[in-house]
């Protein structure tokens, strides 16, 4: 039998895991030989191994101790049993059922001579003192087992302090204190390890004298107690209540009244359901409705500001401010209720009983008799002399020595502010060159970054942020956003903090900066603490070497240590500015909303005098306002730039069964051995497309979210280093891409929305060179995507997370379906300019004449006419009703055109009124009209999956509300169709790409701005470009991990070198993209490669006669003398289409494997020889040009 002291010890963690006791049956038998000791032994230490060995009264009982309801036992019985257990003096050293230690005849004498320790717990809550007495286990060894026990105090309630003290065994003093009780369903139960007042002790002693061992054993299951002790010594367990728990009754009316009284004034108004807004169960729906109203008010203020009266503007602003406050209060209220609910659920057991989890305890244990010392600091973290724990890690420790989760700081709640916007794009003061830093900007832009001019709005943005203004920037992908904060960070003192959403983006930016010798560092959650500590120490130094510090939004939201270091930097005047990259992630209405981004408003709250620069490439007016509010930018200068990407060529191609053959043909004829992305709908599609392209001879790989992170990183690295050319990916391959020389983006399947399509196409041509965006469209993909949307299986915004995702599923499905239908309308539109369709959707006005035939519709030579199809649409709607709304659009099409196939005859649809009514129309025309009815929501497609085969099908149904309007005669439907009169095509360059796969002739519709140059110099430039690419590949292999090819030289830089043929380092500095740091690192290798290539081309014996390199001045004079009058104008040369096509066949046999360049690069380089500077202006021949 086990005494109470040993029971209490079972709930404490052990410092050293004990070994199991040895079998000692021989000692057991030896003890039983003496008849005098049998009785004593049986009454104290025997555990019966077999049922037959138990006394009669015990053998009949079940091993499991039956649970006793608290209401079935009288309180005196409970107290009597507990007092008996608490005062037992018999010691039991059993550690495993059926095994006992050797019997020491002199146990009682030696035991009484040992020291006993008393644990005194001083409670901070009740002020009472509890103490208990037990053996000093640190000095006690159980003979025969080799086990030793360290001294630990008994487990008692209390949060403040436990101190282990020693008292001699002979000291029987009991301190006066209040007994410790736990309240459970109205029953008070005293803890067994508590000391009692002396007067109570005497009564207990008298009670125990009246009880013998048999009475105790009849009421106690020794087997069960020993089993619990055995399990508890292996793993610390929380104490379990023996009584079933009940939830006390709650007065709901009183609770509701209290909640109503605590509501803020904004939530006390009644909603549409007639109850207070804060108490409505549909509060989340009201939030969305109020956001819609707020969006409408904001759009009215933005779009109709000039037409509104001052009173109306004032009313709208007041209403907008009221709605903002109401939305904020309601969202906070919903969040608080959800948090309370989640905390309640996490603290509620799933069974009918529940573990009683003790409160977290910050304690300190001092035990001089042991070598190991564990301390818990005031912050609740373990601290040991040999441990080096991070300061950011905050843990609480419970009574069992287990650390809980990190303690989160209070969530930041943004404040409603009144924002004053200033349009900066047309403000001439920001473009002024009178600022004191203008000279430094221009010098460092050329010297460090290798740029000879600024791109549009770059200078203006830099001037605004360096003037101390908060700036919001809308700039398209590839517009040069990074320079707007990297250049100011270089010339200004202090640290620029950059918040970027992905670690891969951060690493890419840092690699670029290190190549330019600009010191930068990053902090992320995945870094080792030693690395973070080193960075923090550098930030704290008097002269920190870092200019930029990159962090993720999660780091700002959760790291108190980072905020402390920022405060330190600010106090020393070394905090320059905050930069928020991908700022649209702040907005709940943005397509990439991330909750941690909303916590970034704390930066402006803590550091109001530090300017903020927010950058994004995708933001509507509502998203912009939401971002500015969340970040707390009171006086905000806004810079806008067109989303139009002139270097991208858009096309929509019909998707056929030979789609993969068409893709192979397009790549080989237009972008052979160039880098590209193919976006697919599913993982299976990615693998299938990749495998097929490999069979066609392309260096391709697949990438999707189901791959292991290491495997995905390896594939992306291979692609970034040009070891593979084509990556077939789902949209999981997204924001982390910063490769500038992506020449094509192909969509193998239909995108989910126009926003997503525009963003994915934006990954092509970031270097400003001509690139292709091709979408293969089939209506079957629409059915697949719609089904996956309805099942929640498709999310083409991989980072679209946050609590807005828990909004009404019906509303979310409706929004996603509408976005998908807009994408279908975009694909089905064969008339309007592709750029116009995209930019209008994004809220930008665009003149289609500026497209300059860089999309398939503008290149089309078809003559189109308008046709009234109202009667046809009515017939089709009526036909859907007649078929019972249970058939697909394909079946309706067959019936309408008069088909007599098996399906039509099976359902007797040949007898319907409108069977054959459209036999004069082609399948394409009827299909277009049906799709139009679906996109206009007159017909609705019910997409479902077959249970038998798993295939996806859609059934057409009628939207009665819209159909009523159509049949009323108030709606006329007009569509454009090709004219029956064919017009003569002006040239092959005008061929349309909307009717079939693109070919080299169709691709040649891209504008050619320069005349052809003499063939021999084209060949020299092509040879030079190939040699330079091989040099770049070698440099990448020698560079550290993480350095990509475009970090060293981008393709446009290599093309400029190939065209100009610089022969000195001074001439290399004239190349756009080559700064002083890169010329110092790679200049000698570049010049050596150039020299070798020129010698091979002209021959070593002609070197002195053709090209003289005596001095830079003589080279310049010869260059000026040998340039013909037309060379300066025609320096941006490129090869003719016929010439490049002839080389395509030869290129297929000249491929070099293992990352080497191929002769096919000549053709790719020639097609891109319409060079332009980064600011859009043509590059003039400032370098060396060879004579003909």
Swiss-Prot record:
SUPFAM superfamilies assigned: HRDC-like, P-loop containing nucleoside triphosphate hydrolases
Organism superkingdom: Eukaryota
Domain Helicase ATP-binding: 462-637
UniProtKB keywords: ATP-binding, Chromosome, Coiled coil, DNA damage, DNA recombination, DNA repair, DNA-binding, Helicase, Hydrolase, Isomerase, Magnesium, Manganese, Metal-binding, Nucleotide-binding, Nucleus
Subcellular location: Nucleus; Chromosome
Residue ranges of domain Helicase C-terminal in the record: 662-807
Entries under InterPro entries matching the protein: DEAD/DEAH_box_helicase_dom, DNA/RNA_helicase_DEAH_CS, DNA_helicase_ATP-dep_RecQ, Helicase_ATP-bd, Helicase_C-like, HRDC-like_sf, HRDC_dom, HRDC_dom_sf
Entry's Gene Ontology cellular component terms: chromosome; nucleus; plasmodesma
Pfam families according to UniProt: DEAD, Helicase_C, HRDC, RecQ_Zn_bind, RQC
Disruption outcome: Enhanced sensitivity to genotoxic stress such as UV light, methyl methanesulfonate (MMS) and mitomycin C (MMC), and hyperrecombination (HR) during cell division.
GO MF: 3'-5' DNA helicase activity; ATP binding; ATP hydrolysis activity; DNA binding; metal ion binding
Broadest EC class assigned to this enzyme: isomerase
Tissue expression from the record: Expressed in roots, seedlings, young leaves, shoots, shoot apical mersitem, inflorescences, flowers, siliques and seeds.
Region (Disordered): 1-25, 988-1015, 1102-1147, 1168-1188
Cofactors demanded by this protein: Mg(2+); Mn(2+)
The enzyme's E.C. designation: 5.6.2.4
Residue ranges occupied by any HRDC domain in the UniProt entry: 1018-1100
Positions with biased composition (Basic and acidic residues): 1113-1122, 1177-1188
Recorded coiled-coil stretches: 311-346
Family in the record: Belongs to the helicase family. RecQ subfamily.
Protein name per UniProt: ATP-dependent DNA helicase Q-like 4A
The organism of origin for this protein: Arabidopsis thaliana
The organism's taxonomic lineage, starting at the top: Eukaryota, Viridiplantae, Streptophyta, Embryophyta, Tracheophyta
